[in-house]
Amino acid sequence: MKNKFICFVLMSSLLFPWGKTGHRTTGEVAEHFLTEKTKIEIQKILHDPSLAIASTWSDEMRSNPDFRKYNPWHYANMPLSITYANSKKSSKGDIVQAIKLSKSKLKDNNVSFEEKAFYLKYLVHLIGDIHQPLHVGRGEDRGGNDIKVKWFGDDSNLHRVWDTNMIDNYQMSYTELSSHLLRSYSSENIELLSENEWIDESQNKVKIIYSNVKNGDYLGYDYIYENFDIVKIQLFTAGYRLAGTLNEIFDE
């Protein structure tokens, strides 16, 4: 029994912590832009109405074999030469299809609160994912996971650098980082747009990311200096758009 527990802990630590601070930051930022009616509706659905906590639920559930079929929901891989609209869609679903489905389920009065909780938690997570450019990267390198780099001398990969490494370098909690973003950025010039436009934005960014890094590169302070502002803006934008999406669902 002890060995099984140790094995479970090790597997969990290897598979599921990536991006936790970023996702929770996005959820925390979103809370500041929710209407009162939206907050009330969310509280009816979730036992814990914190969007920050809800944001990592879908990653935490990946250890459950029943949830593996939802793994394709977290990304949409396509060649850089074509847009999502012109790409071949996966029969297993992708991040855009999953966002559309989640929104539809949350608007449907015939859907139970239990089922709505499932789709709400996924929606909170996926709107964060779609604003991380490597989640719409190339299929051939699994969104940068197969581009191996050195991060301050340690083994990493391009996807992890954007998901986790740059954020962790600042050693902020998600509450500290969200407070910093809310002080630093304004929602005034951010358009809410749609998931189809979000993925186009991220694809434009990922083209630049790919062009600046190759397999085996050493990344450190220079890379943070050149790119971390993009990470912060994406986290803030994702939070604002998450709130806008939820307000549209629950308060319009």
Regions found by a protein language model. Give the residues of each.
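Sec-dependent N-terminal signal peptides
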Residues: K4-L15
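N-terminal, motif-rich segments that launch catalysis or mediate targeting to/interaction with membranes
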Residues: W18-V124, P133, R138-E252
